[in-house]
Amino acid sequence: PNITTYHRVKRTIWDDTVFRKAAQPYFDKTAPNPAYFNFESFLCEAFDKVPSRLMPDKSRTLFELRTYHSTNEEANQRKVAMFNKDEIDVFDKVGINSVCYGEVLAGPIMPAVMYLTWYKDEPTRNAAWDKFRAHPDWQRIKNLPEYANTATRNTSLFLSPLPYSQI
């Protein structure tokens, strides 16, 4: 995508009467009771392994947006490779359900990768991550020298879908 695509999509959303009707409770928020105080925007490039968004199951009640911070661009490229070559496969095996993955190209947090996953509920999410941490493939991957020092920290933001959510 480019800036032209961004503007076309934005106009398409604003022209979508179904979207606008579903979002009306959000649009009706007032200053004393805002939906948010501000928001951040990121431009991300999709990973080769998951080049487009995957739609979550309708049973989802929990999304997790994770950000992995790297010390420099080279370490970040190795983290992207780690996901593309190995890590996403382990996610699939243990029930960490993918929506999208991206390398941050522009935004307030760089260098970094971000990805969104979904779960039926919090206990299901916790069980999937326990399986991930114990999985033999992860135990092997996390100790490979080519993936050493790829992320300095990670953060998670937990989200709940609203009636007007497109996912």
Language-model features, listed with the residues they occupy:
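Short S/T/G/P-rich N-terminal loop/turn motif that feeds into the first structured element of a domain
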Residues: P1-W138, Y147-I167
